């Protein structure tokens, strides 16, 4: 058996903390009974992070790899994986059971990055959502030796949730005239506490959000002199067809059914004058921008879905 230890310097999610570890295994096939364990890698939290790697040279090395891996997992409280709740962890449990050895994954919480990143899909232009697809977003900026290091790097994408929280720092804002059109553009710019792992661009017919490094820019197309303010609890609103905006059902109870319809995420908004949030109302400006960010982030919310021990 070949054993290696590395110091790791890669971006990673802030959720990865003390007593956590990241695990990845390589096997000959998918079925545990007929598939030999070829390698196992585990990255542990520290300053810097450490990676332990065990590679089989012969068939009998499988048990030794499992034994070495168990010593590290026993010291961990939560196991981070990429698609590990579907493959790596069930495979390991079966292997330990087959050798009649204590299962080091028992009683550990787990976080599967593949599942945790699902709400972020709208932010990426990917044909599929395998580890290699997520790694392509980094454009080869980092040297990755194996899938364990790849999963660690991909975990940093969870930090993109910070794009949708306006920091306490000041926010630059202004109104731009759009050449050749009657519509106007409302633009806001601010700095995030930490640099984002990748550049991001999100847009629809009204909003356009871009991020590069630690700077975020939000552009909003105005309907004349008004802005759309969205509400996330759209199930409590009706969209008024003639008026072109949504109102709470406590206010629409007596509106005829043919003049309203149930609001959905994309039309659950009210219209507010630009002058009410700009230029000399910083408190209202921040409140308005935050409402837009809450609308744009969709299903991205913390805490992450950390699964309880099995």
Show which residues each predicted segment covers.
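DEDD superfamily 3′-5′ metal-dependent exonuclease/proofreading module
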Residues: 1-310
């Amino acid at each position: 058996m070949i054993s290696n230890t590395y110091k790791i310097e890669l971006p990673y999610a802030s959720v990865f903390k003390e007593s956590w570890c990241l695990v990845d295994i390589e096997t000959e096939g998918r079925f545990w009974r007929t598939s030999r364990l070829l390698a196992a890698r585990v990255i542990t939290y520290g300053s810097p992070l450490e990676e332990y790697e065990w590679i089989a040279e012969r068939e009998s090395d499988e048990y030794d790899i499992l034994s070495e891996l168990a010593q590290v997992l026993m010291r961990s409280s939560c196991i981070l994986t990429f698609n590990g709740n579907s493959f790596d962890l069930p495979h390991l449990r079966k292997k330990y059971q087959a050798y009649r050895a204590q299962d080091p994954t028992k009683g550990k919480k787990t976080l599967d990055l593949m599942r945790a990143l699902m709400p972020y899909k709208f932010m990426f232009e990917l044909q599929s959502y395998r580890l290699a697809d997520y790694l392509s977003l980094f454009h080869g900026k980092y040297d990755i030796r194996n899938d364990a290091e790849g999963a660690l790097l991909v975990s940093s994408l969870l930090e993109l949730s910070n794009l949708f929280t306006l920091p306490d720092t000041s926010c630059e804002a202004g109104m731009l005239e759009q050449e050749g059109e009657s519509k106007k553009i409302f633009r806001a710019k601010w700095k995030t506490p930490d640099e984002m792992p990748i550049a991001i661009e999100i847009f629809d017919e009204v909003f356009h959000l871009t991020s590069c490094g630690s700077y975020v820019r939000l552009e909003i197309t105005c309907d004349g002199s008004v802005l759309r303010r969205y509400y996330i609890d759209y199930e409590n609103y009706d969209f008024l067809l003639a008026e072109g905006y949504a109102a709470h059902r406590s206010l629409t109870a007596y509106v005829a059914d043919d003049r309203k319809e149930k609001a959905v995420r994309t039309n659950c908004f009210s219209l507010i004058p630009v002058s009410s949030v700009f230029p000399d109302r910083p408190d209202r400006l921040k409140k308005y921008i935050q409402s837009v960010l809450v609308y744009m982030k969709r299903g991205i919310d913390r805490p992450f879905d950390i699964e309880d021990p099995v």
